[in-house]
C-alpha cells in the first residue's frame, strides 16, 4: 500500500515536494536529494512524519 509523504529540506526547513512510497518495502524514512530554489542547488530532503 502506497502512502503520500511530504519532503522537507534539511538546511532551510521548507516543505516543497510531495511524493509517495511503499511502506511495506521502505519502512524507514526516505532521504532524497532534490532542488531547493532558496539555495539554488540540490539539497537533502527528508520525509516529514
UniProtKB/Swiss-Prot annotation:
It comes from Enterococcus faecalis (strain ATCC 700802 / V583). Belongs to the bacterial ribosomal protein bL33 family. The lineage of its organism: Bacteria, Bacillati, Bacillota, Bacilli, Lactobacillales. Keywords: Ribonucleoprotein, Ribosomal protein. GO terms for molecular function: structural constituent of ribosome. The gene is rpmG1. Signal peptide: none annotated. SUPFAM superfamilies: Zn-binding ribosomal proteins. The keyword Membrane does not apply. Pfam families: Ribosomal_L33. InterPro entries: Ribosomal_bL33 (IPR001705), Ribosomal_bL33_CS (IPR018264), Ribosomal_bL33_sf (IPR038584), Ribosomal_zn-bd (IPR011332). One of its GO terms (biological process) is translation. GO terms for cellular component: cytoplasm; ribonucleoprotein complex; ribosome. PROSITE patterns: RIBOSOMAL_L33. This is Large ribosomal subunit protein bL33A.
Amino acid at each position: 500500500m502506497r502512502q503520500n509523504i511530504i519532503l522537507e529540506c534539511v538546511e532551510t526547513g521548507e516543505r516543497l515536494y510531495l511524493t509517495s512510497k511503499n511502506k511495506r518495502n521502505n519502512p524507514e524514512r526516505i532521504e532524497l536529494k532534490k532542488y531547493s530554489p532558496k539555495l539554488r542547488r540540490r539539497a537533502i530532503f527528508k520525509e516529514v512524519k
